[in-house]
Every structure is written in C-alpha cells, then in structure tokens.
C-alpha cells in the first residue's frame, strides 16, 4: 500500500464509519479494488481509532459529564447507597453504566470469535448477504418504529440489546452504527437518540479492538503479510480523524430531518454491485492471504 492509497482508504473510512453502511465492508471492497488484496482486520481496526477520536472530540462535553457523574456516584459524595452508586436519579451516571453494559456482548464475542472474525467472516459473499439483509431490516424498522424514547429512557435491558446490535458489526457488512441504530429504532428510540447512543457506545469497543490490533501489529510486524505497514496505516488514521469530524456534523443534521431509507437503498444497491463483481471475477470472495492466516 502506498500513501495515496492510504489517503483514499482514510477518506472511505471517514465517509462510511458513522453511516449505517459498514465502513469495514467498504475498506474490504476498496482494498481489493485498489490493492488487489484485503487490507486486513488489523489495518481496519487501527484506522477506526481515527474516526473514534473524532467522536470523542465532538462529544467531549457529554463524555466529560458521563465520566465525572459516574465517578462521583460510584466513589464520591453522591454515592450514598447502592442505588445512588448505580446512578439512580443521575442521567449521566446511568448512561455511563448503560455504556458499560452495552459493551459486554462485543467484548465477549470479540475475544471468543477473534480468529473467525479475522478469517472466515471476511468472505465477501457474507458481506453481500448482510449488506442486503440489514439494509432491508433498517428500512422496515425505521419506517414502522415509534419515536418517543430518548437517551434518558434507556434501561440495562435496552443497553444490552444495543450491545448485541453493535456486536453484529464484527461481521463486515453489518455496520456498527447500522446494528445499533436498527436495534434502537426497534426499541422505540428517536432517530437522534439512536444515533447519539450508537456513537457513545462505540467508543470503548473501537478503542479496545484498535489498541489490541495495534499491539498485535507491533509484535507481528515482520510476519503479518496482510498488514500494510505503519506509515500508510497512520496516514489513513489521521485522514479518517480530520474528515470524520466533518461527517459527524453532517450526519447528525441529516438524521434530524430525514429517514434512513436512503442508506437502506444504498446498502441493497452495494450488495447487488459487489455480488456482480464477485460473479464476473473482478473481486475474489476471500483473499488468499486470509486463507493462509486461517
């Protein structure tokens, strides 16, 4: 991978990370088209740190409030009894606990299915299938969902279900935001609430997987045939951070006024295009280096 290709992939990551269209699927597809090979799970996870840093910058005030209220309830003067320590009566502290609960599914599944995630699940036929299925689900759920629950209405049950939706994004093509937004809309959350919860809940998961993949890349730098090198990877990460911040602003404005129908149609169209490219042999279903790593 050269630096121009890294810049393109950084732009693709920024444009698709927050939208319910699956950034990992786009990186997988564009990587094959530009490089002739899969950029790999490590590259994908590390450049996602850039877009997640943009989330932290944009939601910095919310994050500071969540952390200060959570610590104050758990360890400070606000934690008078166990109910208070669990955030009762404090929306920010409760949200902090909900983010923790929502992170449990992806932590468990990410560790237990790590080898499958990095090999078998990167098959483009799987990507095509989930792009299509979750595109239809998003369209149906968004059209029929109630729109009355806000972030403050979240329960531990809802948080866990959000987490299950997020963990589906371990399959390239599902989309982290697509999974959580679909669950959120099915549970009756407004579009704005579902999106903001999706952003905040992704922070621990993305940083956790990104840092783990970075550590693995350092250890296996000379033997990992798929990893494109630190120079291009860091360039792509920086690009995804800068452009990602702009995309967040635009996306939040969009969902305040429009439905997710356009994204659902895009997912279905992309699934059809990728399927055709697979059939005619332009794209391989799975990269040979992924098979070798299995």
Label every PLM stretch briefly.
Residues 1-294:
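Multi-pass membrane proteins that catalyze or facilitate reactions on polyprenyl-/lipid-phosphate substrates
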